[in-house]
């Protein structure tokens, strides 16, 4: 079931269009993304690196820079500990590259997903002590690791935490929240209550990049040297699915602008193995082609393989590693499809029993793909979903949520069932004893206040715009809205009642459907639907008209360009 909504936000779109030399349609789309006022519109359209905030505004950065500067000057050994996802790998690379280039004595360790689980832990601390490490520097993790950080301090380590995840909290008898920060020498996280940094929505790599900007300033080095890292930062920002607004939008735009000129041999090899160097690279390629290969390393082998690719200086070795990462990701895709089939069977069963939050147990599932499967179930059924699997100790897994359900906060309410957990409103991870599984399912559902209407998939339409309005120029102008992603979604238009004059089906699997369409004003245009033919024809029946949402594109074939719409949602009407 779907509910279609149309944005009705107000502004003088003609005036905005004239002032910024854009089509009024573009002005309306910008307003729909809550970009209001000349200053915000200017930054949205033309934001650049000079608009990024002073890194010293971030709580802990000044103190962290002072410690790091001293450690580098004294030749102390610093070890970076990151997460094993794209954001973690890239954060690690940014810190390693920036500190190494200024003469720092630095190495890294990325926790093994299967052996160590998420984040810094006591085993990692003990290994650092054994290796005579002086300072631990975390990235994309650590904010919830109070015990491990305390253990590190007990063993004489200097502990610097950089993270972007939500800060854990306790609730007193009066219902007031109090932050629970790890007892580190310095904590750098823009989500801390006392942090005055104006844009707290950075990913872990964004926090690391800003920390390194401050470090270069303190070392009296030209921070423009760090701009080579922006393409890597763009990958992390897109793949960690943080809001593509404000500073994140600028970082991604600047990174995409530079990515084909990257001097990083490993990144270049990864782009080449997917034939991307000859194409226009946008956020889609980062999120769905490049990023998954980096993630596959941490899922099925060690994330250090991906990090070592970006540190590689030999082109042949880089090419070989990039090909191996692609093969790993292909294997991951197959495993995911099998897991989704099994999970759907359980999901339908629990949904029929009235569960609002789907807690699914797949004992044979590779724990590294639990989050992907949870995301697929969430997308299919529009319910919050957890996928759990057997682990070395107990069970562990990941959850993905829907709008209106903060997964992290709901998990805080039942934290007694977990041995470990953390995350965001929309995604989380957890570990628990196998005997606690049913208790978790029961409690998380008892607390859930979602109603039936919350499970209807919401389709937010930007503009009810007849296809007659589409022009080549408008499609070109739509590119100013890129990069697309969370909170800056690709625009969605709608047309009511287009006549279907012809249906053609293409593709090996008969899942590419081409419609010849005609508007009431006589405009003819092709519409593409990517769906199984049998499913499509069953929906169509004998209907002659279609109402649809779409995104307009330019189709180029044998040198001939034509207008086309890619249809996202639709229903048929008889006449």
Describe the role of every protein-language-model region:
Residues 66, 70, 74-76, 317-321, ...:
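Mid-to-C-terminal polyanion-binding domains and interfaces
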Residues 2, 7-135, 154-156, 173-175, ...:
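Hydrophobic helix-and-loop "lid/oligomerization" segment in the mid-to-C-terminal part
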Residues 206, 371, 375, 548:
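Short alpha-helical basic/polar micro-motif
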Residues 6, 161, 187-189, 234, ...:
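Structural signal for conserved beta-strand scaffold positions within catalytic alpha/beta enzyme cores
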Residues 126-205, 209-218, 228:
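Active-site cavity-forming subdomains of large catalytic enzyme subunits
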Residues 164-165, 366, 424, 512:
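Histidine-centered active-site/metal-ligand motif
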Residues 178-179, 185-186, 393-401, 524-527, ...:
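Short, well-ordered strand-loop elements centered on a beta-strand within folded domains, enriched
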């Amino acid at each position: 079931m779907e509910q279609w909504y149309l944005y009705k936000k107000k502004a003088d779109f003609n005036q905005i269009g004239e002032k910024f030399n854009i089509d009024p349609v573009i002005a309306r789309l910008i307003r729909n993304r809550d970009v209001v006022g000349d200053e915000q519109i200017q930054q949205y359209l033309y934001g650049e690196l000079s608009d990024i905030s002073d890194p010293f505004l971030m709580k802990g950065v000044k103190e962290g820079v002072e410690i790091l500067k001293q450690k580098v000057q004294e030749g102390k050994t610093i070890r970076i500990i990151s997460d094993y996802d794209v954001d973690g790998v890239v954060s690690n690379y940014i810190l390693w590259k920036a500190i190494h280039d200024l003469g720092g004595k630095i190495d890294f360790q990325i926790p093994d997903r299967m052996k160590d689980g998420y984040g810094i832990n006591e085993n990692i601390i003990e290994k650092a002590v054994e290796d005579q490490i002086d300072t631990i520097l975390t990235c994309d993790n650590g904010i919830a690791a109070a015990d491990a950080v305390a253990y590190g301090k007990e063993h004489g380590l200097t502990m610097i935490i950089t993270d972007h995840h939500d800060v854990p909290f306790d609730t007193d008898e009066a219902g007031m929240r109090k932050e629970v920060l790890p007892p580190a020498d310095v904590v750098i996280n823009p989500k801390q209550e006392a942090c005055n940094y104006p844009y707290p929505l950075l990913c872990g790599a964004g926090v690391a990049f800003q920390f390194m900007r401050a470090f270069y300033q303190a070392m009296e080095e030209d921070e423009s040297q760090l701009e080579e890292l922006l393409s890597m930062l763009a990958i992390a920002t897109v793949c960690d699915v943080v809001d593509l607004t404000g500073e994140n939008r600028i970082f991604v735009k600047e990174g995409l602008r530079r990515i084909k000129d990257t001097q990083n041999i490993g990144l270049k090899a990864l782009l080449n193995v997917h034939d991307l160097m000859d194409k226009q690279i946008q956020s889609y390629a980062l999120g769905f082609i490049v990023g998954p290969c980096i993630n596959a390393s941490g899922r099925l082998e060690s994330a250090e393989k991906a990090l070592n690719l970006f540190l590689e200086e030999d082109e042949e070795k880089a090419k070989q590693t990039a090909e191996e990462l692609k093969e790993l990701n292909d294997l991951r895709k197959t495993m995911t499809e099998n897991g989704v089939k099994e999970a759907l069977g359980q999901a339908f069963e629990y949904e029929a029993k009235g569960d609002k939050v789907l807690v699914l147990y797949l004992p044979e599932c590779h724990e590294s793909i639990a989050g992907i499967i949870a995301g697929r179930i969430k997308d299919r059924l529009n319910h919050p979903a957890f996928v759990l699997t057997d682990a070395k100790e107990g069970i562990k897994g990941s959850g993905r949520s829907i709008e209106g359900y903060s997964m992290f906060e709901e998990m805080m309410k039942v934290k007694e069932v977990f041995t470990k957990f953390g995350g965001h409103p929309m995604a989380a991870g957890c570990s628990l004893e196998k005997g606690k599984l049913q208790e978790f399912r029961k409690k998380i559902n008892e607390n859930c206040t979602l109603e039936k209407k919350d499970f209807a998939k919401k389709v937010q339409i930007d503009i009810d715009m007849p296809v007659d309005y589409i022009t080549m120029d408008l499609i070109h102008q739509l590119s100013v809205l890129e990069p697309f992603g969370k909170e800056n979604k690709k625009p969605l238009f709608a047309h009511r009642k287009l006549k279907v004059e012809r249906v053609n089906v293409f593709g090996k699997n008969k899942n590419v459907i081409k419609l010849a369409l005609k508007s009431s004003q006589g405009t003819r245009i092709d519409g593409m639907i990517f769906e199984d033919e049998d499913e499509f024809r069953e929906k169509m029946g004998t209907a002659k008209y279609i109402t649809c949402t779409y995104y307009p594109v330019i189709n180029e074939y044998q040198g001939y360009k034509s207008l086309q719409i890619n249809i996202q949602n639709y229903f048929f009407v008889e006449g």
